Each structure stands twice: as C-alpha cells, then as structure tokens.
Amino acid sequence: GHASSVFRDVYRKQELGLTLLVILLLINSLVMHKLVVKPLVHYIASVHRGDPMPVEGALELQSLAEICNAAFEETQETQKIIRHEAEHDPLTDLLNRGSFNRIFPICCQGKTPFALVLVDIDHFKSINDTCGHTAGDEAIKRIASQLKSAFRSEDYTFRIGGDEFAVIMVDVSEALREPLEERLRLLCDTVAGSSTGLPPISISVGAAFSDRRNPESTLFNDADKALYDVKEHGKASYRIFG
C-alpha cells in the first residue's frame, strides 16, 4: 500500500509538472507571437507596401525597426533629390525638357483645355558673345524667375533649350484670350524694364490654346508659328495663334 501511494504521488507530480510545462509552452508561444511573430508579420507587410516599419514587439525588434526606419527615411529623401534633379533644369530649377516631353502629351490627351506659351530670349547669342557666358546664365535665370512670377503656381514652367522656355497654363480656354494677352504684354514689359546689371533683354512669345478654333497643325507647331511671326516682325513682343 505504501509503495502504491508513493507511486501515485510521483505520478501526480509528473502529471502536474507536464501540465505546468504545457502551460509554460503555451505562454511562451503567446509571448513569442506577440513580441516576435506578430511584429515580424507587420514588418514584412510594411516593406511590401513601401511604408515605414511599426515600432513594436521585443526591444531588439523595436531597435531594428528604428534603424530600418531611419535608413528608409534617408533613402526616401535621396530618391526625392534624385527625382528632382532628373526633372529640373540645374541652372534655373524650372522643369526640364524631359519633363516637358512627359507632361505635354498627357495634357494633350486630356479633356481639360489649356494654353501653351513658348518664350525665346531675343539676341541671346550676342549677349553670350559680347558679355560672356556668365551674363548669359544670369539672363536665363532672370527670365526663369520672371516666368515663375508671371504665371500661376498650378501652371508648368519649363526650360526646354538654351534660351527657350515653355509654359503650360492648365485649365485655360480660348475664352480667356484677352486676359492671356494682357498677361503676356505685362511679361514682355517686365522683362524689358528689368535689365539692371545686364545688357538690355527682351523676349519673343508665341502662344496657342488647345481648343483654338482653326488649328493649322499640332498645338506645339501652332504656338511655334505664333512665336516665329513675332520674331519676323521685330521681336520683343507676343502673339497668340488664331
């Protein structure tokens, strides 16, 4: 009887020990899931989405997330700088020719009317030849600044060549022809009256509306034709096609 009692007591202790072990394993599993597995699942999902990692879970994982997030932010900032440099002209910080070639066709395919304005600096070669390239660069930067001031923040302003610029005025129809004429007149006057420290500068401007009544060619060619007409008749002025 005594041996049997001892055996039962040992058996109960083993049973209790196994039960406690199972409970501990379950608790450990839950803790592991909360502190390790679940955060890792969230981390992986964040990486797939391209989002910063959530700072959660075990301290080691939180530290890892913070390090990864710092690297993520640095990469995002670097990509933003690279994208800006790829899309903008380094001298003027206007959008560049590549951006024009990407944005202009999108506007042409859309249903919202817009205006294309082409701008050339008059006698730019002679400025470069007589005053040097530094003066030429200053002239380009000044025109770029005046273009940004003359048009709205929602419009796209580009430097598309050495002394050539373009502006896409969004959501503008031919019904606004007179206000655009006034804007271009003021622009030409502003440029002509602000050549302090530089030789006299003037610009020739040609424009066309996407909804013009009697197009002769593509929008770009019709705006370019208007610009050519200005150059043929003395420069330092503007013309809207049609």
Predicted regions and their residues:
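Membrane-interface helix-start motif
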Residues: 1-18
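Catalytic core regions of nucleotide second-messenger enzymes
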Residues: 159-160, 175-177, 188-204, 231, ...
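Cyclic nucleotide signaling catalytic output domains
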Residues: 157, 204-212, 218-233, 239-242
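Membrane-proximal alpha-helical signal-transduction linkers
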Residues: 32-56, 65, 72
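The cytosolic transmitter module of two-component sensor histidine kinases
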Residues: 57-64, 136, 177, 216
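Conserved long alpha-helical elements within nucleotide-processing catalytic cores of c-di-GMP signaling
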Residues: 80-87, 96-115, 122-152, 158-162, ...
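Cytosolic-side ends of inner-membrane transmembrane helices, especially those
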Residues: 20-38
